[in-house]
C-alpha cells in the first residue's frame, strides 16, 4: 500500500496555521513548525509494515497548493491521512470535496484529531471522508485499517467508516489499550525532522526535536483541554527506552534540545529512573530537555534533580490567579502552589514558561486584575522566564464547551471563529477591550526593569542572544496583536 501522511497548505490572510502537535490552534504571523509526534509514529509504523510512505507537510515545507497537489498526485496514494482541528475542519471538508477522486479513484481519505473525535458524525455528513480514526492512538488504528484491507470485521474500536452501500458505520468508542513500548522509534529522516528543528520558539539550542514519553497527561481532567478528548487514559513508555531514544538522537542527528511534549511529564518512579539514567550516561551534558509539568506535585528537590539531569525549560499551565476559576477548570491546584512551584523551579536553574488564559465567562475586572498582577509579579521576581497569553477557547468535546453551550455562553458555533483571534466565549462581566488591555499589560511585564535585568544577566552565549532576540521580536508583535484583537504567544 501507498500511504501519505499529509498536511495540505491552508493559505490564509490570517497567517501560518499552527496545526501539528498543538493543543490550542493558532494562526501565526511568523512561521512556527512543531514536529508532529503521533503522525510521525504512524508514518514509521506504516514503513515498518512494508508500505510505501510519503511525508508531505505542505505547511512546514511552505509549498504552494499546486506543488502540494502535484507531489501527492505523483505518489498515487492508496490512503491519505490528514490531521485536523476545530478552526480548520471546514477547510479540510472543502479540501476533501475538491480532491476526492482526483488522484486515484480508489484512494481512501482519513481524518484524525480531537475535533473529529468529538464530533465524528458531523464530518462524515459534511465531507466525503472515508475513515475517521478517533482517539489519540490513531497511529495504531491506521495500522489496523490498512492491514484489514477493507474487512470491517477486523477493525478495532474507534473507527468510523463508509460501508459498501455508502452508509456510515462505526466500531464503537475508542480504547487506549495499546502498548506504547511496541511503537517504533520515529524514523526522523522519513518524517523530514529538519523542517521542524529550527523555527520553534521553545528551542534555545538548535537543532531541536520532539518526542513523547507518555500519552498524554496524568491529570487529564482540565475541562478546557482539547487533548483530554483524545487521551482520557494516561500511559507511559519505559523510561529506559526513552533515554535510549534520546541517546540515539544525540549521536545520530546531533540534536541539542528535545521537547518531551507529553501533556505532563511522567513523575514518580519514571522521573527518578529517567533522571538518574540521563546523568549516568552523561547525556545531561550533551542535550537539553524541555517538558510540560503541573504545579502542586513536585518538590524543590525534584526540580533540582531535573536540572541536574539536563532539563532546561519547564512549561506550566496557570490559566488564572483566581481559585474559583482553577476549581471550575478542575485544575486540582491551589493559587499558592503556582508561586511556590515556579520559585522552586527557577531557583533550581530551570527556565519556567507560564501560560495564562483570559476571557473566562465568570471573571470580571477584579479577577482579571489578579491574573495580570500574578503574571507580572512572576516575571519581576524571576520566577518565570517566558509566558504566554491566550483567549479562552472551549473546544468541542471538552466539558467547558458542553457547559457553555448549555448555558448559551458561546458567541458562535462557526468553527472558523475558534482560532483565538477573537472571543467565542460570552464575557458579561468584562468587555473584549478590557480583556485585550489586560493581556497587553501582561506582555508589558517583560519591560519591567527587574525583568529586563534578569534577562541580561542570563544572556551568556550566542544561543541565549539569538533566543532572546527572537523573544523581543515576538513581544513587539504581540503588543500589536492584542491592540487589533489578534493573539499569539510570547517566547
Residue ranges and their predicted role:
Residues 2-5, 69-72, 78, 199, ...:
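Radical SAM enzyme core and accessory elements
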Residues 38-176, 397:
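Glycine-rich beta-alpha loop elements in corrinoid/cobalamin-binding modules
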Residues 181, 186-353, 360, 370-373:
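Radical SAM [4Fe-4S] cluster-binding motif and immediate context
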Amino acid at each position: 500500500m501507498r500511504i501519505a501522511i499529509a498536511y495540505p497548505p491552508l493559505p490564509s490572510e490570517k497567517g501560518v496555521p499552527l496545526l501539528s502537535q498543538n493543543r490550542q490552534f493558532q494562526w501565526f504571523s511568523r512561521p512556527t513548525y512543531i514536529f508532529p509526534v503521533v503522525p510521525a509514529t504512524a508514518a514509521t509504523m506504516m514503513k515498518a509494515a512494508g508500505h510505501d510512505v510519503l511525508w508531505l507537510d505542505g505547511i512546514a515545507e511552505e509549498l504552494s497548493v499546486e506543488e502540494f497537489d502535484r507531489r501527492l498526485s505523483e505518489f498515487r496514494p492508496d490512503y491519505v491521512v490528514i490531521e485536523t482541528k476545530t478552526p480548520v475542519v471546514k477547510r479540510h471538508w472543502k479540501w476533501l470535496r475538491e480532491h476526492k477522486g482526483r488522484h486515484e479513484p480508489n484512494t481512501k481519505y482519513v481524518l484524525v484529531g480531537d475535533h473529529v473525535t468529538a464530533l465524528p458524525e458531523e464530518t462524515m455528513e459534511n465531507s466525503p471522508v472515508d475513515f475517521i480514526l478517533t482517539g489519540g492512538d490513531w497511529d495504531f488504528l491506521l495500522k489496523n485499517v490498512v492491514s484489514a484491507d477493507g474487512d470491517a470485521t477486523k477493525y478495532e474500536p474507534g473507527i468510523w467508516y463508509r460501508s459498501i452501500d455508502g452508509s456510515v458505520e462505526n466500531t464503537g468508542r475508542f480504547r487506549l489499550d495499546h502498548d506504547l513500548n511496541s511503537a517504533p522509534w520515529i524514523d526522523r529522516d522519513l518524517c523530514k525532522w529538519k523542517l521542524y528543528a529550527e523555527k520553534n520558539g521553545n528551542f534555545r539550542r538548535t537543532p531541536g526535536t520532539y518526542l513523547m514519553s507518555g500519552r498524554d497527561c496524568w491529570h487529564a481532567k482540565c475541562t478546557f483541554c482539547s487533548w483530554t478528548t483524545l487521551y482520557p487514559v494516561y500511559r507511559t513508555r519505559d523510561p529506559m527506552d526513552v533515554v535510549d531514544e534520546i541517546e540515539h538522537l544525540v549521536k545520530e542527528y546531533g540534536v541539542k534540545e528535545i521537547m518531551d511534549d507529553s501533556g505532563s511529564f511522567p513523575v514518580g518512579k519514571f522521573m527518578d529512573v529517567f533522571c538518574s539514567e540521563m546523568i549516568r550516561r552523561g547525556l545531561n551534558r550533551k542535550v537539553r530537555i524541555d517538558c510540560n509539568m503541573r504545579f502542586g506535585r513536585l518538590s524543590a528537590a525534584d526540580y533540582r534533580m531535573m536540572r541536574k539531569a539536563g532539563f532546561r525549560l519547564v512549561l506550566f499551565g496557570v490559566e488564572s490567579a483566581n481559585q474559583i476559576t482553577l476549581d471550575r477548570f478542575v485544575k486540582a491546584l491551589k493559587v499558592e502552589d503556582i508561586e511556590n512551584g515556579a520559585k522552586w523551579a527557577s531557583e533550581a536553574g530551570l527556565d519556567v514558561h507560564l501560560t495564562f488564559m483570559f476571557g473566562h465567562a465568570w471573571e470580571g475586572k477584579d479577577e482579571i486584575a489578579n491574573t495580570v498582577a500574578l503574571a507580572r509579579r512572576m516575571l519581576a521576581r524571576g520566577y518565570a522566564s517566558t509566558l504566554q497569553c491566550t483567549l479562552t477557547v472551549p473546544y468541542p468535546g471538552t466539558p467547558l464547551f458542553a457547559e457553555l453551550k448549555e448555558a448559551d455562553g458561546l458567541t458562535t458555533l462557526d468553527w472558523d471563529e475558534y482560532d483565538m483571534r477573537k472571543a467565542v466565549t460570552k464575557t458579561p462581566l468584562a468587555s473584549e477591550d478590557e480583556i485585550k488591555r489586560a493581556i497587553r499589560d501582561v506582555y508589558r511585564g517583560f519591560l519591567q526593569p527587574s525583568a529586563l535585568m534578569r534577562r541580561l544577566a542570563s544572556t551568556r552565549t550566542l544561543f541565549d542572544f539569538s533566543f532572546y532576540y527572537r523573544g523581543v521580536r515576538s513581544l513587539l508583535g504581540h503588543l500589536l496583536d492584542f491592540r487589533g484583537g489578534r493573539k499569539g504567544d510570547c517566547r
